[in-house]
């Protein structure tokens, strides 16, 4: 009898004991909430330092007084730093973990932005290099951070991240000129964005402190970053990331100046770049929703890439006062960045795989992506106008459309399938170790 009375006891306590196991849940929920806040704030930072400078290049050149070479070099520094510092991110993540790597990056970003307050060519260049190096680490580490902490919400969290990234670019492009006028200094207008990075760092500190002190596992030889370039899927992802970086940063760097030279005032030209980013915020939601549907990944990639091509043609053929049309089309086209980030985040079967893919795609992509802003600036200096640079940009946009088709063609309908050909329901890339198309 005492046996029968004690028999129900363990089952009754097992469920009860299951709840104490999740007793740290409130703390985990708090850290998860801080994580979402950090994703939002980091997203706001990632383009603010670039778009604010883009809107102020005209005023900076007048006040600081740099020549044509520096004018062509400055817009190329972000992509160059994204390539070089981005390549070191995989090593840094292995050494200290993804959370601490991001915390270090935010400190670096803040220091670099603050340096740009000094109105001299040397401090402008140094501050840009330091701040963009911090952004580079965030760029590469964030897909891994999202995968590690929000594995079942990768697409949704990537959407939040890219939407806030676009918002940061929109706000900074729109308010940088008025802010600089208010502060009576384009250098102070640039440095003011250090306030946002300080707030982000403060929000991220609890996450870094709560992180386990274990270094992230090194990628296996099959997913070692540079070996991914020998796989078809790794090569296609890297090639596409490269072409979209060339296309996007060419516009982010030069659109205001193109429109100013066409007759628009600096404030309106900055607003056009802001408008493009607003459109990106809205279209990102639709593109990510479309990409998550069976067969929708290819359509989303083609819509975004095709829109960018039309925007580049419109910018070439329409007068500056009609800038709203190309701004809308280019803004829609920027949405392809969110799509390729989702593909990177879901690449392979582990966080280490995603970090490896993110490292190689962003390092190579941004290194070659420097050809965009620098090439357009050089073509403008040599030709004395924007016709030749914009013809080159149309060619880049056409190449992006072709690569979008090839990338999504690695799956018959953009939907991941298992070995038996069954739909797994995920719009992901082939596991990277396979290295072959489906």
Question: What positions do the PLM features span?
Answer:
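A late C-terminal transmembrane helix in Major Facilitator Superfamily
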Residues: 348-386, 393
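Juxtamembrane intracellular "pre-TM" segments in multi-pass secondary transporters
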Residues: 18-29, 209-237, 425-428
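Helix-loop-helix hairpin linking two adjacent transmembrane segments in secondary transporters
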Residues: 121, 152-153, 159-209
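C-terminal transmembrane helical hairpin of 12-TM major facilitator-type secondary transporters
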Residues: 297-340
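Conserved MFS/SLC helix-loop-helix module at the cytosolic interface between two early adjacent transmembrane helices
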Residues: 84-122
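Cytoplasmic helix-loop-helix junction between adjacent transmembrane helices
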Residues: 129-163
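Helix-to-loop junctions at the C-terminal end of transmembrane segments
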Residues: 85-97, 283-296
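Extracytoplasmic gate region of multi-pass secondary transporters
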Residues: 53-54, 232-281
């Amino acid at each position: 009898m005492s046996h029968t009375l004690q028999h129900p006891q363990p089952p009754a306590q097992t469920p009860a004991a299951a709840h104490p196991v999740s007793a740290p849940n409130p703390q985990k929920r708090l850290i998860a909430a801080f994580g979402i806040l950090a994703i939002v704030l980091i997203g706001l930072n990632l383009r603010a330092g670039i778009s604010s400078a883009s809107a102020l290049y005209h005023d900076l050149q007048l006040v600081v007084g740099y020549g044509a070479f520096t004018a062509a070099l400055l817009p190329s520094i972000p992509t160059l730093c994204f390539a070089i510092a981005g390549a070191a991110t995989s090593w840094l993540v292995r050494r200290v973990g993804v959370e601490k790597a991001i915390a270090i990056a935010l400190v670096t970003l803040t220091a670099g932005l603050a340096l740009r307050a000094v109105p001299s060519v040397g401090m402008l260049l140094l501050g840009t290099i330091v701040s963009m190096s911090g952004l580079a680490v965030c760029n590469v580490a964030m897909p891994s951070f999202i995968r590690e902490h929000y594995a079942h919400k990768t697409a949704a969290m990537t959407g939040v991240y890219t939407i806030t990234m676009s918002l940061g670019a929109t706000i900074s492009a729109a308010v940088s000129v008025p802010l600089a006028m208010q502060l009576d200094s384009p250098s102070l207008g640039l440095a003011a964005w250090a306030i946002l990075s300080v707030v982000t760092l403060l929000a991220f500190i609890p996450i870094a402190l709560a992180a386990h002190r274990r270094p992230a596992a090194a990628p296996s030889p099959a997913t070692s970053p540079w070996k991914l370039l020998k796989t078809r899927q790794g090569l296609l992802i890297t090639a596409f990331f490269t072409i979209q970086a060339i296309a996007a940063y060419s516009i982010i760097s030069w659109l205001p100046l193109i429109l100013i030279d066409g007759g628009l005032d600096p404030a309106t030209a900055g607003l056009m770049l802001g408008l493009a980013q607003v459109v990106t915020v809205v279209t990102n939601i639709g593109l990510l929703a479309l990409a998550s549907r069976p067969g929708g990944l290819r359509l989303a990639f083609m819509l975004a890439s095709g829109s960018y091509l039309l925007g580049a043609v419109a910018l070439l053929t329409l007068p500056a006062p009609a800038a709203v049309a190309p701004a809308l089309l280019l803004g829609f086209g920027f949405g392809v960045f969110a799509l390729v980030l989702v593909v990177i985040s879901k690449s392979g079967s582990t966080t280490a795989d995603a970090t490896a893919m993110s490292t190689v795609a962003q390092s190579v992509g941004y290194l070659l992506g420097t050809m965009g802003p620098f090439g357009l600036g050089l073509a403008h200096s040599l030709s004395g106008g924007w016709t030749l640079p914009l013809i080159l940009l149309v060619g880049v946009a056409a190449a992006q459309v072709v690569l979008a088709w090839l990338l999504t063609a690695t799956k018959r309908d953009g939907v991941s399938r298992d070995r038996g050909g069954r739909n797994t329901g995920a719009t992901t890339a082939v596991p990277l170790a396979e290295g072959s198309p489906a």
